[in-house]
Amino acid sequence: MAAFATAEACDSNAELISNGDLRALHPIFKIYGQRRCFSGPIVTLKVFEDNVLVRNQLETKGEGGVLVIDGGGSMRCALVGGNLGQLAQNNGWSGIVVNGCVRDVDEINDCDVGVRALGSNPLKSTKKGHGEKNVPVHIGGTLIRDGEWLYADSDGILISKTELSV
Ligand SMILES: O=C([O-])CC(=O)C(=O)O
């Protein structure tokens, strides 16, 4: 995929920004994974300290998509670790954004996938299978809908209602 720059995308899409179709997430995420720059259509998940749905989703073909996980901002355990990072890479996900924590950071950093999360915590999550898929989630000051597009690079993360021509 051609490299893009989120700053450039903001400058050249002022109208989309003013009407709310292009939004920047608040700068609350840390950068993990090999891909500092990634983009794709969004699949949303809403879970709380339980990552069964995360694994189920990453076991499917990603086809260049980005999994956006609203973990409610919990800092008490990790929703994604090295195994799931590897699964995401092998199944063709371009990235994972977690409103929550990751673990096995060194392993995730070896994976060919972009990962953003609030931080890391070595504790694993529960495995009950609770949560919702393909629902609107509220992360980093913006509402994110399943099927919208995400663009991430070193400057930050953009959410766009439609695919941008970059
Ligand atoms: O299964 C988990 O809880 C997450 C994890 O450690 C991994 O992906 O390796």
From Swiss-Prot:
Residues that hold substrate according to the record: 81-84, 103
GO molecular function: 4-hydroxy-4-methyl-2-oxoglutarate aldolase activity; metal ion binding; oxaloacetate decarboxylase activity; ribonuclease inhibitor activity
Keywords noted in UniProt: Acetylation, Lyase, Metal-binding
Residues modified to N-acetylalanine: 2
InterPro entries: RraA, RraA/RraA-like, RraA/RraA-like_sf
GO BP term (any one): regulation of RNA metabolic process
DNA repair as UniProt keyword: no
Cofactor section: a divalent metal cation
GO CC aspect terms: plastid
SUPFAM superfamilies the UniProt entry points to: RraA-like
Superkingdom of origin: Eukaryota
Record family assignment: Belongs to the class II aldolase/RraA-like family.
Protein role: Catalyzes the aldol cleavage of 4-hydroxy-4-methyl-2-oxoglutarate (HMG) into 2 molecules of pyruvate. Also contains a secondary oxaloacetate (OAA) decarboxylase activity due to the common pyruvate enolate transition state formed following C-C bond cleavage in the retro-aldol and decarboxylation reactions.
Assembly description: Homotrimer.
Protein's name in the database: Putative 4-hydroxy-4-methyl-2-oxoglutarate aldolase 3
